Amino acid sequence: MGALNSLPDEPQYVGLAEKTGFSFEQIGILHKRFKQLSNNGETLRREDFNTIPDLLCNPIRSQIIEAFFDRRNFRQTDAVGTVHEIGFGEFLVVMSHFRPPSIRLDDEQKEVIRMEKLRFLFNMHDTDNDGTITLEEYRHVVEELLSRSGALGKETAKGIADAAMLEVASISMGHMEPDEFYEGITFEHFNKLLKEFEIESRMNIRFMNMDTTTLCK
């Protein structure tokens, strides 16, 4: 699965750096974290993430863990389904979705990164890969993004998220016929709903005391 036998040498770093945007130094740091999580093994399984204290109380803990084993997040063309274990390459690619964008990017590059992060967020909640997420899942996304801004308390963020969910429900279902079934929020709708959110700097997680907000050039 692309696992690396030892600390990646420079030629391997080049490919990984180009694919993920991480610097050689950052890749080295993440490789050490990978080895710690895998008990110095070559692959990671879902159970290896159960030892991470910062994930234990996260309300979307299961979705975060599952995201590491979702082929859609490996930046491979038309990849679907899940895997039982991942190597360092896959781990690094998924981690790059949580990496804040470089301040040196132009507007077009920033938009590409924003869309990648939105797709990653959507995939995280679209667990059955049917192209839609539920209103409740959308509420979770909004609450998480607001909570991570640091400007709002947890209860305030929850209240705003509840209101956002109800607003989407009223708009979506208000245009439906009585016999129609609400199929959920598509990615296109999801993108429009979150257009006012600055998700680029709010998607971060901690792994064994390593904050991904520090992993920017």
Predicted regions and their residues:
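EF-hand Ca2+-binding helix-loop-helix modules
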Residues: 1-125
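EF-hand and EF-hand-like helix-loop-helix modules
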Residues: 49, 64-73, 90-92, 102-128, ...
